[in-house]
Amino acid sequence: MAVPKKRTSRSKTNSRFANWLNKSNLQAQRAISKAKSITNKKNTVNDETIETE
């Protein structure tokens, strides 16, 4: 028989959203850092070789 599930608390929802937001901000910072590194024509980014033309 179908039984409704318990509702997720607001604090748990907020905690999960904050965790997701922090992860996305970290990824954005890394992307910006790589872009800056490439525009400054450095040869390596995080031990990866980037070929510049």
Curated annotation (Swiss-Prot):
<dbReference type="GO" id="GO:0006412">
    <property type="term" value="P:translation"/>
</dbReference>
<comment type="similarity">
    <text>Belongs to the bacterial ribosomal protein bL32 family.</text>
</comment>
<dbReference type="GO" id="GO:0009507">
    <property type="term" value="C:chloroplast"/>
</dbReference>
<keyword id="KW-0687">Ribonucleoprotein</keyword>
<keyword id="KW-0934">Plastid</keyword>
<protein>
    <recommendedName>
        <fullName>Large ribosomal subunit protein bL32c</fullName>
    </recommendedName>
</protein>
<dbReference type="Pfam" id="PF01783">
    <property type="entry name" value="Ribosomal_L32p"/>
</dbReference>
<dbReference type="InterPro" id="IPR011332">
    <property type="entry name" value="Ribosomal_zn-bd"/>
</dbReference>
<dbReference type="GO" id="GO:0003735">
    <property type="term" value="F:structural constituent of ribosome"/>
</dbReference>
<keyword id="KW-0689">Ribosomal protein</keyword>
<dbReference type="GO" id="GO:0015934">
    <property type="term" value="C:large ribosomal subunit"/>
</dbReference>
<dbReference type="InterPro" id="IPR002677">
    <property type="entry name" value="Ribosomal_bL32"/>
</dbReference>
<keyword id="KW-0150">Chloroplast</keyword>
